[in-house]
């Protein structure tokens, strides 16, 4: 009798966890998306600005593990500048 109750309880917990976890593990980014999932080029640089502004600015290197020489966010800032220059170049070629 106790075994049947344990199986039912376990089944309910697995069902509950199986339905709640996927809803909280997924994140959807939809900045500047048009129907069909296509991005507008003029809004891409604004999108990158919005995303990168969410990260805190870290001036000193991260030394949690003792081997990091560079801030983990430094690459994000460099990538923002690189992608911004590409989108600006793309906008200039389309306007010609």
Curated annotation (Swiss-Prot):
Q: Which organism is it from?
A: Verasper moseri
Range of residues in the leader sequence? 1-26
Question: What's a Gene Ontology MF term here?
Answer: gonadotropin-releasing hormone receptor binding
**Which tissues and organs express this gene's product?**
Preoptic area of the brain.
CC terms in the record's Gene Ontology section: extracellular region; extracellular space
Tell me, in one coarse class, where this protein mainly resides. secreted
Pyrrolidone carboxylic acid PTM positions read 27
What role does it play? Stimulates the secretion of gonadotropins.
Kindly provide the name given to this protein in its UniProt entry. Answer: Progonadoliberin-1
Family from the record:
Belongs to the GnRH family.
